[in-house]
């Protein structure tokens, strides 16, 4: 059964917000020292990547600026962590990549609401 695309996009948006909220006010050193926060952020990245994998080709083609493949790839890296999770990559994803992509995801939600 194919999941409603709106739900997948909402999951991406919500987990982006969550990840940003989890690290709010933390330095990199505080983040990597806080196991609970680190694990919560990794879980959010898992949800984002899994939901990105469920996005249809139609949506991917309509919104090519969204790094769909990279979001799914990050999920695989943090979940399968073959040689340990790269904490700096997780930090950069949440501090730099998510804030850049979140407005694009928000626009998709608005566009889907107009259907």
Task: State where each predicted segment sits.
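Solvent-exposed interaction patches of small proteins and small membrane subunits
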Residues: 1-115
């Amino acid at each position: 059964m194919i999941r409603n695309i709106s739900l997948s996009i909402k999951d991406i948006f919500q987990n982006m917000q969550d990840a940003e909220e989890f690290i709010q006010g933390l330095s990199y050193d505080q983040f990597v020292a806080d196991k609970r926060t680190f694990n919560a952020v990794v879980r959010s990245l898992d949800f984002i990547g899994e939901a990105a994998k469920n996005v249809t080709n139609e949506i991917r083609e309509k919104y090519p600026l969204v790094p769909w493949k990279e979001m799914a790839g990050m999920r695989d890296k943090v979940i399968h962590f073959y040689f340990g999770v790269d904490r700096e990559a997780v930090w950069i994803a949440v501090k730099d990549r998510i804030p850049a992509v979140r407005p694009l995801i928000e626009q998709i939600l608005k566009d889907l609401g107009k259907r």
